[in-house]
Amino acid sequence: PMFHCNGWCYPWTLAMLHARVICIRNIRAKEIFDLITEHKVTHFGGAPIILNMLVSAPKEEQKPLKHKVYVLTAAAPPPSIIFKKMKNLGFEVMHVYGLTETYGHILQCAWNKEWDDLNEDEKADISARQGVRYPNLEDVDVMDSETMKVVPRDGKTIGEIMIRGNVV
């Protein structure tokens, strides 16, 4: 979607790369599969609800992909089952995090080679996490908003995402 933070970044990058951009007015699974096949789409962005629509579409609407399609998804992390089902359809999904106030995505769950040996459920769970910062961001951490101390990286302690850089 080319609105809020995406509208400020992607169109310019895509134009710079001479990429073909396909915009659709009505979001329907059949149309998405048809366009991916017809135009050999390699990358697309969609919210978790779009990914859910694709994996839940009737089998006759789901076209087998002859090539890998890389997907960026943002908003709330998709359930791990969505990552597994998308992979089974031929999509490689990366969850990213960003804000309108940061000119787009600033964190990505970049795959780590040491995760290759995990089982499919563990891989899907890890894929929903946030990971490393994009190079355009100076610093990011999760902190206690009252003490301004970094919280433990234990997957349990709640904190606020603190962002610093010239894109904020």
PLM regions and their residue ranges:
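Short, Asp-centered acidic motifs that coordinate Mg2+ and/or phosphate
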Residues: T42-H43, Y70
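Tryptophan-centric aromatic hotspots in well-structured domains and transmembrane helices
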Residues: W8, W12, F33, G45, ...
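A generic secondary-structure micro-motif detector
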Residues: P1, I22, V71-T73
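Conserved AMP-binding/adenylate-forming
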Residues: A19, T37, V69-V71, P78-V96, ...
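Helix N-cap/beta->alpha junction signal
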Residues: R25, A47-P48, A75, G165
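Adenylate-forming
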Residues: M2-F3, K30, D34-E38, P48-V69, ...
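Conserved AMP-binding/adenylation subdomain of ANL enzymes
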Residues: F3-T42, A57, D139
